[in-house]
Amino acid sequence: MKKLTYRKIQSFQAIITVLVIFASFYLEYAAGLQPCPLCLMQRVCVFILLGLMGVSLGTVKKAHIVSLIQFQVACAGLYFSLRQLWLQSLPSDQAPACMPGLDVLIQYFPWQTVAKALFWGAGDCAEVTWTMFGVSMPGWAAMYFLSMAIMGLFLFFRTRTIN
């Protein structure tokens, strides 16, 4: 059996992450789904993860630190996706009120309101607009972030004794 190395694992994760990014842009531009604030935060986490994987492919030095940061970013993405799943599970009368688009929020509202919408979500985050095999988009995102967090933690413990 071939040995799984740090770079092979990170390369595989980078390929999965690129596929997730392509899927998110496909759903936005080809399928016409507008991302809610929590979706945007999840996308930011995916881009940060891809950047970390790119850094880790360049050098194996400090791989344990990169893996720990990868774990933390994946946990942040997991928070955003679980928050959105929770909002989607609320009855319609308990869901938060819809807010204007992010561009309008940034232009006309104070930064505290923008930050609250980005970190806590809004009414449009509670809408289920797309499912695959009965699982909504934040459910798939939660599975992705959970797998990235587990692999980040695994790589952290595996590489901290090497470096």
Curated annotation (Swiss-Prot):
Localization (cell): Cell inner membrane
Transmembrane segments: 10-26, 45-58, 65-82, 140-158
Primary localization: membrane
Spans within the Periplasmic topological domain: 27-44, 83-139
A single GO cellular-component term on record: plasma membrane
Example GO BP: protein folding
Disulfide bonds: C36-C39, C98-C125
UniProt cross-references to InterPro entries, sorted A to Z: DiS_bond_form_DsbB/BdbC (IPR003752), Disulphide_bond_form_DsbB (IPR022920), DsbB (IPR050183), DsbB-like_sf (IPR023380)
Stated name of the protein: Disulfide bond formation protein B
Organism per entry: Legionella pneumophila (strain Lens)
Ranges in the topological domain labelled Cytoplasmic: 1-9, 59-64, 159-163
Coiled-coil regions, chain positions: none
Keyword Electron transport: yes
Pfam family, one: DsbB
Keywords annotated in UniProt: Cell inner membrane, Cell membrane, Chaperone, Disulfide bond, Electron transport, Membrane, Oxidoreductase, Redox-active center, Transmembrane, Transmembrane helix, Transport
Keyword Transmembrane appears in the UniProt entry: yes
Family of the protein in this entry: Belongs to the DsbB family.
Domain of life: Bacteria
Listed GO MF terms: electron transfer activity; protein-disulfide reductase activity
Gene (UniProt): dsbB
Membrane topology summary: Multi-pass membrane protein
SUPFAM superfamilies attached to this UniProt entry: DsbB-like (SSF158442)
Function: Required for disulfide bond formation in some periplasmic proteins. Acts by oxidizing the DsbA protein.
PANTHER family membership: DISULFIDE BOND FORMATION PROTEIN B
